[in-house]
Structures are given as structure tokens and as C-alpha cells.
């Protein structure tokens, strides 16, 4: 008799920030991302918010690994506060792992994290799960989605992504790999849905780059640019 696959959202649904989710099958748990959320104007005295990991703390011995999709704060920012409590291995692409190492050091985390760098296309066996990282296009290099092979079927976690055929950095989202999975059959798709309620599509980053080039070229004085990571 087949077991039960549980999807446990710990943050990030219906909100921007605190992205964190767990998948459980039998005695095995994997965790995807661990982000923070910045407070709104009504949350006086709060510097940031992190997910409630009570579910995981009760089952910390069952956690086989934590998978990080990319290096934005809403996906890695809570790790300095949660990882010492969970003490589990962390898997991420190279740039994401480097950003996470800096984050952990700056926040004063004691001890050496069990941090593993994973290449896209590489598969990681974690208990009942086998996870493959695949490239997606996002506003930061080395962004990835996850193909999670479970005893009940394939779960695809998109990570944060956009469809951009002419990205300025990194490669486009690997639609051919997703097409292959579609042909095999996918049990569940967990997809980024930011601004999905709006009609139309998001233009390429190249269009934005061309506009910025024109603005900067026409500026008569010093140009200051504010960016985020």
C-alpha cells in the first residue's frame, strides 16, 4: 500500500516573503527555502519576520535536507536563525551557496553549516526523495527549480521564474526539460504565481536594459542606480 505524500507550507503563500515549504513521505522530510519577510508600516518594532518552524522542530531527526532555489532574502534570509535549530544539510547552486555563506557569517552563526553545492541536472538522493535542480530565469543568477521524484510521482517546484527568451544574465528557463517531464506525467506542480492575476506578459530583461541605456546616455549629470539582491 502506497504511503501518503504531505505538502506543508510554512510561509510564502499569499504573501511576498517567508518562502518555506516542507514535503514529507513516511519518515522522510525535505525542506524548500527559508526566507524572511520585511514588515509593513503597521508592524512597529519588527525588523523582519521568519517562518514558524514548530512542525519541523518536532520532527528534526526526519529532515533529510534543505533545498534552496536562489539567493534572494525572501528565500534564504531566515536560514541564519533556523539552521542552528534544524542542523540539516543544505543544497544549493554555486552562487546561492556563496551568498548563503556570507549571510550566515554576517549574522554570526556559530559552527560550520553542512552546505553542498549542486549543479543543474545533478540529482541528490534524500531518503524517499530524489531531487534534480534545473535552471530557471530570474532576476538573480543561478536561480533553480526543483524536480522532486517521490514514491507517488514527480513534483515540480518552479522556484521564482519568468519566461524570458533573451535574458541579460544566465540562461532562459529550461522549458525543454519541463516538456520532457510533462510527457512522462507530473503528479503536482508548485509554481511561482507572482502577479498571475494581471493580464499580459512580462517583457524581457533586455527591453529594460535598452531603456536604461537610453536614459543613462541622455543624462547630463551623475547617475545613481538602486538595486536589490
Where would I find each of the regions flagged by the language model?
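His/Asp/Glu-rich metal-coordinating catalytic cores
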Residues: 2-67, 72-227
Amino acid at each position: 500500500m502506497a504511503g501518503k505524500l504531505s505538502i506543508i507550507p510554512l510561509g510564502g503563500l499569499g504573501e511576498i516573503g517567508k518562502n518555506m515549504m516542507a514535503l514529507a513521505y513516511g519518515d522522510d522530510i525535505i525542506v524548500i527555502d527559508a526566507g524572511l519577510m520585511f514588515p509593513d508600516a503597521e508592524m512597529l518594532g519588527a525588523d523582519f519576520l521568519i517562518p514558524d518552524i514548530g512542525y519541523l522542530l518536532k520532527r528534526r531527526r526526519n529532515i533529510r535536507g534543505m533545498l534552496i532555489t536562489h539567493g534572494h532574502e525572501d528565500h534564504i534570509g531566515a536560514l541564519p536563525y533556523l539552521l542552528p535549530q534544524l542542523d540539516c544539510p543544505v543544497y544549493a547552486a554555486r552562487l546561492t551557496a556563496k551568498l548563503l555563506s556570507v549571510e550566515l557569517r554576517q549574522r554570526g552563526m556559530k559552527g560550520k553549516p553542512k552546505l553542498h553545492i549542486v549543479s543543474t541536472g545533478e540529482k541528490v538522493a534524500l531518503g524517499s526523495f530524489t531531487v534534480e535542480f534545473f535552471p530557471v530565469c530570474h532576476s538573480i543568477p543561478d536561480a533553480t527549480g526543483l524536480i522532486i521524484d517521490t514514491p507517488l510521482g514527480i513534483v515540480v517546484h518552479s522556484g521564482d521564474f519568468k519566461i524570458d527568451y533573451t535574458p541579460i544574465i544566465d540562461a532562459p528557463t529550461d522549458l525543454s526539460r519541463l516538456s520532457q517531464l510533462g510527457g512522462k506525467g507530473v503528479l503536482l506542480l508548485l509554481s511561482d504565481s507572482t502577479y498571475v492575476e494581471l493580464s499580459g506578459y512580462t517583457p524581457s530583461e533586455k527591453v529594460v536594459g535598452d531603456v536604461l541605456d537610453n536614459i543613462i546616455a541622455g543624462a547630463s549629470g551623475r547617475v545613481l542606480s538602486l538595486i536589490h539582491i
